[in-house]
């Protein structure tokens, strides 16, 4: 089973959009996948679920339940550690790790774990999402929304991953804003300064077919389990 932790360079960069497209390509290619969203916030306007959880379930055509993919959810779209403190919820690294590792014995080809926001999103006053990734010791897929500031955000995230010896399996350029200029130049700059080639360049209204090459890379034997 391949395992990947999906994070963004920031919040609202398209992590869940990328996750759902990866799910779609796995479903079309008969790759057995499961995408978890351990911590979620922001209730959907269409149901009592958090919006990201609902999107993932819809991508799977509801063959999984919310409880199978999500452990902790908050109705308000607020930083997890803030709303957790307000509602007296403990976002425990150990509990999250156990929730994720409980899926390791399932018959899956690939397991995605979609994080909450960016690499250093706080879970409490003394822990961040980075602590969970370090505890799991699995590779990261980084989503960067190509816009003003993305070069700095992407390089900072990659540098922090490198500093903690966390493998970057790939980074995805989410080019969903047609008004942004010099997209290729920004991607090239990130590649040159980070030393990592862009794994996929995704445009607005991308089809799942745009993710086939990326899915082949992720499922390949060369990728660490």
UniProtKB/Swiss-Prot annotation:
EC code(s) of this entry: 6.3.3.3
GO molecular function, one term: magnesium ion binding
Residues annotated for substrate binding in this entry: 41
Catalytic activity: (7R,8S)-7,8-diammoniononanoate + CO2 + ATP = (4R,5S)-dethiobiotin + ADP + phosphate + 3 H(+)
Subunit (UniProt): Homodimer.
Protein role: Catalyzes a mechanistically unusual reaction, the ATP-dependent insertion of CO2 between the N7 and N8 nitrogen atoms of 7,8-diaminopelargonic acid (DAPA, also called 7,8-diammoniononanoate) to form a ureido ring.
Protein name: ATP-dependent dethiobiotin synthetase BioD
Source organism of the structure: Francisella tularensis subsp. tularensis (strain SCHU S4 / Schu 4)
Gene it is expressed from: bioD
């Amino acid at each position: 089973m391949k395992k990947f932790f999906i994070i963004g360079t920031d919040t609202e960069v398209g992590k869940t959009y990328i996750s759902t497209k990866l799910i779609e390509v796995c479903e079309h290619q008969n790759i057995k996948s499961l995408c978890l969203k351990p911590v979620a916030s922001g209730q959907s306007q269409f149901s009592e679920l958090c919006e990201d959880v609902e999107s993932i379930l819809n991508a799977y055509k509801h063959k999984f339940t919310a409880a199978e993919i999500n452990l902790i959810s908050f109705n308000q779209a607020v930083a997890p550690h803030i709303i957790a403190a307000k509602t007296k919820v403990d976002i425990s690294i150990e509990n999250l790790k156990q929730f994720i590792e409980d899926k390791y014995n399932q018959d899956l080809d690939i397991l995605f774990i979609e994080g909450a926001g960016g690499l250093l999103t706080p879970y409490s006053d003394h822990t961040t999402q980075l602590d969970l990734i370090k505890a799991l010791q699995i590779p990261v897929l980084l989503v960067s929304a190509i816009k003003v500031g993305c070069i700095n955000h992407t390089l900072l995230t990659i540098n922090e991953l490198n500093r903690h010896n966390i493998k970057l399996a790939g980074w995805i350029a989410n080019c969903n804003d047609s008004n942004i200029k010099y997209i290729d130049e920004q991607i090239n700059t990130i590649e040159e300064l980070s030393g990592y080639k862009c794994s996929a360049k995704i445009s607005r209204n991308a089809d799942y077919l745009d993710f086939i090459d990326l899915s082949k890379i992720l499922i390949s034997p060369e990728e660490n389990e």
